Amino acid sequence: MGRRGVTKKRNRIDRVKTRVVVLGSTGSIGTQALEVMADNPERFELVGISAHGSKPDVLAQQVRDFGLDLGRVAVASEHTAEWLDGEFGAHCIRGKDSARELVEAVGPELGECDVILNALVGSLGLDATLATLGTKAKLALANKESLVAGGQLVLKAADEGQLIPVDSEHSAMAQCLRSGRVDEVDSLVLTASGGPFRGYTRAQLEDVTPLQAANHPTWSMGQMNTLNSATMVNKGLELIEASLLFGIPAEKIDVTVHPQSIVHSMVTFIDGATIAQASPPSMKLPISLALGWPDRIADAQPKLDFTEATDWHFEPLDDEVFPAVILARQAVTAGGTMPAVYNAANEEAAVEFLNGRLSFPRIVDTVAATMEACQHLSAEPNDLEDVLAAEREARAKAHERMATWLSD
């Protein structure tokens, strides 16, 4: 017997499985999350999923692989829901509010769920985020747009430690911030790969195509996130999210271009020390950390190999060619629902670009013009309807501005 009665079995830890619901299960983050859970069956149990329904075969295979009860599967598409019912001889949750309805059906007070991963795309994820926080389940948040749009509304709904970031940058910051107190932070540094158009001029960007924008140099992501990375709007959204999550003013959050995407974020403290989190570019590490927080999951992804010669390069972001980050700082400073305006305008402009009707630089031009037209929307929202109203106005203003360019 060892000291204090500890035997040779001291490394054994009896764990209760963490029960997880994944919203957006057929997307890039969702599918990787399911892979993490499949690789760690002793740690995680999948109890529910939601999806839009645009990939019915993938969705059906997930149901089979994890032996899910169809009553814990939510599908936005009525057509896919009917097909799924026929495949399994049961009834799934369906309709545009199905993700929220799933969340409300499996909260921890009902004894079914511990963690809900919100991997939905766009500000449509806000409703599910607020519903999750209401259940008191841990929220693993990959849907950055819901925090950007909801702002203080989301933060006020969250209990201490309830909201865990999944974005690689914010996961990295959360890890780095363990090295000191928030009042000891001098600045946060977000890293950006630079996207497929790093080094381009504004004139060169005029002719880029949606196919070119989809070719990210280091990350494999969904269509919208890949486009946002190309415009640097993704980095603007991450700046807003970091300011909200960690309580750091926007002017103390910097962005640097790091093409290798190995250093995911850094925190500089008041004594001059800079703490960085580095790992190969893979979302499985931040996903596994969010699902298991605060514990780490062994072998979540390959480790860096320092026996090989490696160069890590950093350079400043060209704000004149890529002004999205400057606009994001302005949105944080304006406050209220201005971050929601920023996001909504981008969502509308991105669709026009992807459909071949708007040039690439006009995406961020639309965001700037919409923010200018919506300066009065700087009051803090009282409820979800205030956010939705601001988004509706922003989307309308964005289309008014784009119409002048589309008619040229």
Swiss-Prot record:
NCBIfam families in the cross-refs: Dxr
Keyword NADP: yes
Residues that bind 1-deoxy-D-xylulose 5-phosphate: 144, 168-169, 193, 216, 229, 234-235, 238
Domain of life assignment: Bacteria
GO function terms (MF aspect): 1-deoxy-D-xylulose-5-phosphate reductoisomerase activity; manganese ion binding; NADPH binding
Name of the molecule in the record: 1-deoxy-D-xylulose 5-phosphate reductoisomerase
Any matching Pfam family: DXP_reductoisom
HAMAP family, sorted: DXP_reductoisom
UniProt record, GO biological process: isopentenyl diphosphate biosynthetic process, methylerythritol 4-phosphate pathway involved in terpenoid biosynthetic process
EC number, as in UniProt: 1.1.1.267
Gene3D superfamilies: 1.10.1740.10, NAD(P)-binding Rossmann-like Domain (3.40.50.720)
Binding site for NADPH: 26-29, 143, 145, 222
The entry's keywords: Isoprene biosynthesis, Manganese, Metal-binding, NADP, Oxidoreductase
Role: Catalyzes the NADPH-dependent rearrangement and reduction of 1-deoxy-D-xylulose-5-phosphate (DXP) to 2-C-methyl-D-erythritol 4-phosphate (MEP).
Primary gene name: dxr
SUPFAM superfamilies the UniProt entry points to: 1-deoxy-D-xylulose-5-phosphate reductoisomerase, C-terminal domain (SSF69055), Glyceraldehyde-3-phosphate dehydrogenase-like, C-terminal domain (SSF55347), NAD(P)-binding Rossmann-fold domains (SSF51735)
TM spans (from-to): none
Essential cofactor(s): Mg(2+); Mn(2+)
Organism the protein comes from: Corynebacterium jeikeium (strain K411)
Residues the record lists as binding Mn(2+): 167, 169, 238
Record's catalysed reaction(s): 2-C-methyl-D-erythritol 4-phosphate + NADP(+) = 1-deoxy-D-xylulose 5-phosphate + NADPH + H(+)
InterPro entries tied to this protein: DXP_reductoisomerase, DXP_reductoisomerase_C, DXP_reductoisomerase_N, DXPR_C, DXPR_C_sf, NAD(P)-bd_dom_sf
Family under the similarity heading: Belongs to the DXR family.
Pathway(s) the chain acts in: Isoprenoid biosynthesis; isopentenyl diphosphate biosynthesis via DXP pathway; isopentenyl diphosphate from 1-deoxy-D-xylulose 5-phosphate: step 1/6
